[in-house]
Each structure stands twice: as structure tokens, then as C-alpha cells.
């Protein structure tokens, strides 16, 4: 199979563990999921043959996760809310507290991530509004069998997902791609590790909605 001609979103759906590979090489499979593997690899000057070989290995493994391509949407939506929405609401306030501490205590150090707490607060505010709109408007429409009529709200949600992806790039820039200095304290290291976990969760969250839930809802699946 020539994986290079497939989009990152298609590959992430067909080979669930491919998402970890894409994160390893900083390939955006959620907001940038429509670009082909070849295009994405070319932008980052990655070895396309190596990526295809890794994908072939993953493709040969038996699936270990729930098949969201076939599961009822009424199962997928509660999973998204419990696994991702509720988790983000826990993650971000704690990360903001730690970021404020690191910026205050280490403000004179060159590697101090000045502005990180403010950026995380912006993400929390925007994401909170976004998730509320999904839970109060879009998800009830889909659960009521009105997915075909939800093109407008889905378009808005996808645009906001793109905005979230851009906000994550700001976080990566402020933190030197989540790389703490050699002499970083435990709070600093825990902060960057926690942000890394949040980014992983958010990318999985957006992937599940953009590449699976929304297309299936628009096709009128239940």
C-alpha cells in the first residue's frame, strides 16, 4: 500500500496507532489532517520511505482500540465528553497555576517561558466556550439524528479546531518545544510534561471529531 498518497487524517483513522508516529515527527493529523503524508513529510524534510515502513509495521498489528469508524455515534459522543472535554477542564487550570509559579520564581532566567500562563488561560477560555457549544448545540443535534442538518455548526467547530492548533504552536514556541532547561526545577519539568499530555489529548480529541464524528454525522449515520 502506498501510504504517501493518503491524507494524514485517513491514515490516523485506518491505523489508530499511527497517531503516535505522527506526533513523534510533529505531523499534524488533526487540524492539518487533509494534507497527504507525502506533502506533510516534504514540508518537514522527512524520509517518506521510513515513514511508510513504520506505518506498514503498525498496519500489520491487530487493533487494540475501539473501532470508532463503526461504533454508534451515541456511544462516541459521551466518550468524547468524558475522555476529553472533562479531562481538559481538569488539565488546564492546574497547568495555569504551575505556569504562573514558574514565571514568577524563574522570571530572571533566559529560558523562562514568559507569557505561557496567559497563553494557557486564553486556550482555556476559548476551549471552554467551544466545548460548551458542542455539548449544548452540536452534540444534541447529532444525537437527535439531525447530523445532515449540522453542516453549519460543524464548520464553525472545525474552524475553532484550527484556531486551537495555532494556539498550541504558540505554546511550543514559548517553551522551546516543551524542552525544560537542564537546571529546571521539578515544577518546571512537571509543567512541560503536563502540557505535553494536554497537547496529546487535544490532538486525539480533534482527530476523533474532525476525521470521524463530523463526517459520519454529515452522512446521516447514527
Curated annotation (Swiss-Prot):
It holds the Pfam family Hemerythrin. GO terms for molecular function: metal ion binding. Keywords: Cytoplasm, Iron, Metal-binding, Stress response. Its main location: cytoplasm. It is found in: Cytoplasm. The keyword Repressor does not apply. It comes from the Bacteria. Di-iron-containing protein involved in the repair of iron-sulfur clusters damaged by oxidative and nitrosative stress conditions. Belongs to the RIC family. YtfE subfamily. This is Iron-sulfur cluster repair protein YtfE.
Amino acid at each position: 500500500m502506498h501510504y504517501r498518497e493518503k491524507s494524514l487524517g485517513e491514515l490516523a483513522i485506518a491505523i489508530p496507532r499511527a497517531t503516535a508516529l505522527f506526533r513523534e515527527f510533529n505531523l499534524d493529523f488533526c487540524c492539518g489532517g487533509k494534507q497527504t503524508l507525502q506533502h506533510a513529510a516534504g514540508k518537514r524534510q522527512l524520509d517518506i520511505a521510513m515513514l511508510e515502513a513504520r506505518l506498514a509495521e503498525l498496519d500489520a498489528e491487530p487493533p487494540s482500540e475501539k473501532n470508532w469508524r463503526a461504533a454508534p455515534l451515541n456511544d462516541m459522543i459521551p466518550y468524547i465528553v468524558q475522555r476529553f472535554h472533562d479531562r481538559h477542564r481538569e488539565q488546564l487550570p492546574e497547568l495555569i497555576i504551575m505556569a504562573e509559579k514558574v514565571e514568577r520564581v524563574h522570571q530572571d532566567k533566559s529560558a523562562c517561558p514568559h507569557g505561557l500562563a496567559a497563553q494557557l488561560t486564553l486556550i482555556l477560555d476559548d476551549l471552554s466556550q467551544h466545548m460548551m457549544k458542542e455539548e449544548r448545540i452540536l452534540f444534541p443535534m447529532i444525537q437527535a439524528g439531525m447530523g445532515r442538518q449540522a453542516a453549519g455548526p460543524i464548520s464553525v467547530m472545525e474552524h475553532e479546531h484550527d484556531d486551537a492548533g495555532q494556539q498550541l504552536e504558540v505554546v511550543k514556541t514559548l517553551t522551546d518545544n516543551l524542552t525544560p532547561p537542564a537546571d529546571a526545577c521539578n515544577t518546571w519539568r512537571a509543567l512541560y510534561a503536563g502540557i505535553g499530555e494536554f497537547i496529546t489529548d487535544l490532538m486525539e480529541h480533534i482527530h476523533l471529531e474532525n476525521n470521524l464524528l463530523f463526517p459520519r454525522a454529515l452522512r446521516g449515520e447514527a
